[in-house]
């Protein structure tokens, strides 16, 4: 909660740590490079990987993400109460997920309520960790602005962002594309 209020916190791990995990996975699989794709927080990690481990990234696709600069890629403030709801049972998790996806889902590409409930049930059954989610949010909220780092990225880059995105405002995608020389920006209406 302190991080949401703009207070300084210490995150247990950072986006750089998670990018390093991606490189470790490449090493484990015996791959020198990969075409790296990330969505939302995954896009932040993919961007970080491309900036910090340039020799390991063959191309970058950043989807519905942002640079870490606080003036772009903001979240619709109406989502905050929904993001902070405690979901302590499977049924509560499914119900809250359904409400959340009604708010953040793509208006032009809606999921059925049944599909959202099934995905939420699968997520709960795999194991939802409130502490893990809190650590990931801390990593996002304590990330530095990557704009300067992104200027060093010199691999083919595609930035995809929905024009109706409530979770990460389209300004985040635009800023990402502007930060990477030669990046292609694909804006999707209704997403």
Where are these regions (language model features)?
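Acidic beta-to-alpha connecting loop that harbors the catalytic carboxylate
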Residues: 163-165, 183, 190-191
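Conserved acidic catalytic loop of the alpha/beta-hydrolase fold
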Residues: 12, 16-34
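Gly/Ala-rich beta-loop-alpha elbow adjacent to hydrolase catalytic centers
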Residues: 38-42, 46
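Conserved alpha/beta-hydrolase "acid-adjacent" motif
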Residues: 166-172
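Residue in the alpha/beta-hydrolase core beta-strand immediately N-terminal to the catalytic nucleophile
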Residues: 35, 58-61, 151
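Alpha/beta-hydrolase
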Residues: 75-148, 152-155, 175
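Short beta-strand/loop motif that positions the catalytic acidic residue
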Residues: 153, 159-161, 165
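Flexible "cap/lid" loop of the alpha/beta hydrolase fold
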Residues: 47, 51, 58-90, 132
